[in-house]
Regions:
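Glycine-enriched alpha-helix->loop->beta-strand junction motifs that scaffold or abut catalytic
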Residues: 1, 20-26, 46-50, 67-74, ...
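N-terminal active-site wall of soluble small-molecule enzyme domains
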Residues: 1-53, 61-64, 90-93
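Active-site-adjacent loop and "lid" segments of alpha/beta metabolic enzymes
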Residues: 4, 83-85, 91, 101-106, ...
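A cross-domain feature marking catalytic cores of carbohydrate-active enzymes
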Residues: 5-7, 30, 54-56, 77, ...
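Catalytic cores of alpha/beta
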Residues: 10-21, 57-68, 105, 109-128
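Glycine-rich phosphate-binding active-site loops on the catalytic face of alpha/beta enzymes
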Residues: 17-37, 74-83, 123-141
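Glycine/Thr-rich beta-alpha phosphate-binding loop at enzyme active sites
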Residues: 66-91
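C-terminal helical cap(s) of enzyme catalytic domains, especially alpha/beta-barrels
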Residues: 92-96, 119, 134-154
């Protein structure tokens, strides 16, 4: 599995640090970065062969991400103010992405059914954190999400 540094990244040092730690990708959150800083961090990450997963939540965030050069866009299903999750958010915002951008459904994915629903709509990339961490059997949970088993305990 690829290693994503999921943190509040806001400076160049953290990008270099991510490389040193062996990360394959970094999470850059549109809401906490000004547009120029976002663009600079994407460029730096790319130059260091790190994938930049740019997290968005609103239509305005999509515009900012596109202008900054985001190629991989994580659509956060979780409202970071209320912490409510809406799995429909990804599908609502998906048509607004540029054709060359890769969509990642992020937050609230808990079952193979959720995965299949997104795949039926053309989303094949997922950021799964909380459900995996809370699982008593993370390996079994991943197998279940991938359709290798119906039972998390296997």
């Amino acid at each position: 599995l690829p290693v994503l540094r999921k943190d509040f990244i806001f400076c160049d040092y953290q990008i270099f640090e991510s490389t040193a730690m062996g990360a394959d990708a970094v999470l850059l959150i549109v809401r906490i970065l000004d547009p120029q800083r976002l663009a600079n961090l994407i460029q730096l990450a790319t130059s260091l062969r790190l994938a930049a997963l740019v997290e968005i939540y609103t239509e305005a965030d999509i515009e900012t991400a596109a202008r900054a050069g985001a190629q991989m866009v994580g659509i956060n299903n979780r409202n970071l103010t209320s912490f409510e999750t809406d799995l429909g958010r990804t599908l609502k915002l998906l048509p607004l992405l540029q054709p060359a951008q890769v969509a990642v459904a992020a937050s609230g994915i808990r079952s193979r059914r959720d995965i299949r629903h997104y795949q039926a709509h053309g989303v094949f990339n997922f950021l799964i954190g909380e459900s995996l961490v809370r699982s008593e059997n993370p390996a079994g949970f991943l197998k279940m999400l991938q359709g290798e088993t119906n039972d998390v305990s296997e």
